[in-house]
């Protein structure tokens, strides 16, 4: 008997199984196809706005995704470099096949982890507690806990034009049947969501004299804090083009055969990743939409047509593609399609990702209504950590909104109405100046170490880095930069300092002043500073912390206020009916979501500040 069974080996399942095994639990990972683990069923990329931050957080906690993309990436870019550091987001194109092969090797090398090719079609529950899983082969396997990471496989239905086929991820992969019904019988409620993917085309059929080349960054930072430099790594270009008025006219001729407009698709699709037909229908004033041509690997001719997600008939798809500049002779290898699938509203899970209806049963990934590889991987990681800790009778690890984007993600899931596929944005995080990609290790290594996923040496390195930041900051506050040196460093039109010089910490708040420039101008100063730390990553942290010092102090004060509400626990059996003074809507929402803390309750739409005040009085605070 295993401690933990993980059903599904996508991005959530892989991280869940690795986290469980690395934290000391025996784990079995079950997949319908073990050659397709961590498959990138949609875009061949990791990271991007907010998603890059999540990927680095996964790494800081001891997960695998960042290492995988560093090893298999084919193009690396830092997005939003023209904006402040809170908005900088790493993104990488992946070699889709190599990524799966890398993750398969990692899974097979893990000591406490076994793999099984089969399909989970049901669960057994005894006395409100998880007991075992039922397999398609007829076997029943017992375990202490289970994590369901089913992706889009639950009663999956694929749509291409007016045709539809049962499919879990592609037409070639069958859906999972029986598991939804088993969960409903155990007390869960389910609904349908929809997502889609663009066609893939043969990159040899693209006219590269017309499309715009997009190269990767020359010296990109790695995703993983443990990877070392990836500068000099071979990269491959992406390409940019756009739809035309003719494209839109062609696609409109297929609207009468679109499952989206005919009502065949009942599931709600992702608001922020609409299909091309939806974009044309909703934004009639737009003459064109950007199309990004993204290679799927070094050793394949398949190209992903980002921005052209569609479920229109195949003849309309190919005609539309061939109306796009640079794609007049394009050959379509695989058509785009939409897929409907079952999910379970995340109001049915706790912050630990354990379900409320069945003890020791956890949900992670698209089963909770999210979209995106990174969001799924983050949930899998936390579910694996917390399932393992639950079996050891240890408290769950809860990341707060001020700790990580992962904390924002999980908090949003358990407090908001998730009626469409949820994806993370930087705007979702009110503390995004604190939650930067560059400081994920400083924020989260302690949690990974507590969970048993970050070893002692790595944790000591992080503590040493943090100490160097503190000592370097103190040094810069104590050292005065001579006025003449500052004059030479500042642009002529800038405000000149008063006589007497300026502390180095204050000078670094001026535009254009960096530690490297100060080091170049003042060799003795540089020598003294480098005795404290010669680590450029330490220098980067010091510069950011000083430049945004006032803003960071305000954010930290705000997090302290929120922390007081987070410390007030609401028992799961709390009797809201007995609390006089609650609004009727507030009581209804509190009964539906059953928040675990007063802070969580305060973020539920429909729960007013006066409702929170009433609860504080009831709790005796």
From Swiss-Prot:
Keywords: Cytoplasm, FAD, Flavoprotein, NAD, tRNA processing. Its main location: cytoplasm. One of its GO terms (cellular component) is cytosol. InterPro entries: FAD/NAD-bd_sf, GIDA_C_N, MnmG, MnmG-rel, MnmG-rel_CS, MnmG_C, MnmG_C_subdom, MnmG_C_subdom_sf. SMART domains: GIDA_assoc_3. GO terms for molecular function: flavin adenine dinucleotide binding. This is tRNA uridine 5-carboxymethylaminomethyl modification enzyme MnmG. It comes from Chlorobium phaeovibrioides (strain DSM 265 / 1930).
């Amino acid at each position: 008997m295993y401690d933990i069974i993980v059903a599904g080996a996508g991005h959530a399942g892989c991280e869940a199984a690795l986290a469980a095994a690395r934290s000391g639990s025996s784990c079995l990972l079950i997949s319908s196809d073990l050659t397709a683990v961590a498959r990138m069923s949609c875009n061949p990329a990791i990271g991007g706005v907010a998603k890059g931050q999540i990927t680095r957080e996964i790494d800081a906690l001891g997960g695998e995704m960042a290492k995988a993309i560093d090893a298999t990436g084919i193009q690396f870019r830092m997005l939003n470099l023209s904006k402040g550091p809170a908005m900088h987001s790493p993104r990488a194109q992946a070699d889709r096949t190599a990524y799966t092969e890398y993750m398969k090797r990692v899974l097979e090398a893990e000591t406490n982890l076994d793999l099984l090719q089969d399909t989970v079609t049901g669960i057994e529950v005894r006395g409100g507690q998880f007991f075992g899983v039922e397999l398609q082969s007829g076997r029943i396997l017992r375990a202490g806990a289970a994590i369901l990471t089913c992706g889009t496989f639950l009663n999956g239905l694929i749509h291409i034009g007016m045709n539809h086929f049962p499919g879990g991820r592609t037409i070639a992969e069958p859906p999972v049947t029986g598991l939804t019904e088993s969960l409903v019988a155990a007390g869960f409620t389910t609904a349908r969501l929809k997502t889609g993917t663009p066609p893939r085309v043969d990159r040899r059929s693209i006219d590269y004299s017309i499309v715009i080349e997009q190269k990767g960054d020359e010296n990109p930072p790695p995703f993983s804090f443990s990877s070392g430099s990836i500068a000099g790594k071979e990269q491959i270009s992406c390409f940019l083009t756009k739809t035309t008025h003719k494209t839109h006219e062609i696609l409109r001729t297929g609207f009468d055969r679109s499952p989206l407009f005919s009502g065949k698709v009942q599931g709600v699709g992702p608001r922020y990743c609409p299909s091309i037909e939806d974009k044309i229908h909703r934004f009639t004033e737009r003459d064109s939409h950007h199309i990004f041509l993204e290679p799927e690997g070094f050793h394949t001719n398949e190209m992903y047509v980002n921005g052209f997600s569609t479920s229109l008939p195949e003849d309309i798809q190919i005609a539309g593609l061939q109306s796009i500049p640079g794609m007049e002779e394009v050959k379509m290898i695989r058509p785009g399609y939409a897929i409907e699938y079952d999910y379970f509203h995340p109001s049915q899970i706790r912050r630990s990702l354990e379900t409320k209806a069945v003890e020791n049963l956890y949900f992670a990934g698209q089963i909770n209504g999210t979209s995106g590889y990174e969001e799924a991987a983050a949930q899998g990681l936390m579910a694996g950590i917390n399932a393992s800790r639950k079996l050891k009778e240890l408290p769950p690890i809860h990341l707060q909104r001020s700790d990580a984007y992962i904390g924002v993600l999980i908090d949003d899931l358990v407090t908001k109405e998730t009626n469409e596929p949820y994806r993370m944005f930087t705007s979702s995080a009110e503390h995004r100046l604190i939650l930067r990609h560059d400081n994920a290790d400083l924020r989260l290594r302690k949690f990974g170490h507590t969970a048993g996923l970050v070893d002692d040496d790595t944790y000591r390195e992080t503590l040493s880095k943090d100490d160097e930041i503190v000592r370097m900051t103190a040094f810069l506050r104590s050292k005065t930069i001579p006025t003449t040196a500052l004059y030479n460093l500042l642009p002529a039109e800038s405000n000149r300092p008063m006589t007497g010089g300026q502390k180095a910490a204050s000078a670094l708040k001026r535009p254009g002043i960096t530690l490297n420039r100060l080091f170049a101008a003042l060799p003795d100063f540089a020598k003294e500073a480098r005795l404290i730390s010669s680590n450029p990553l330490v220098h980067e942290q010091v510069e950011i912390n000083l430049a945004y010092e006032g803003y960071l102090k305000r954010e930290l004060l705000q997090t302290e206020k929120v922390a007081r509400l987070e410390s007030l626990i609401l028992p799961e059996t709390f009797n809201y009916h007995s609390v006089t003074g609650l609004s009727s809507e507030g009581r209804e929402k509190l009964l539906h979501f059953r928040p675990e803390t007063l802070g969580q309750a305060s973020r539920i739409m429909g729960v007013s500040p006066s409702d929170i005040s009433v609860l504080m009085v009831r709790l005796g605070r």
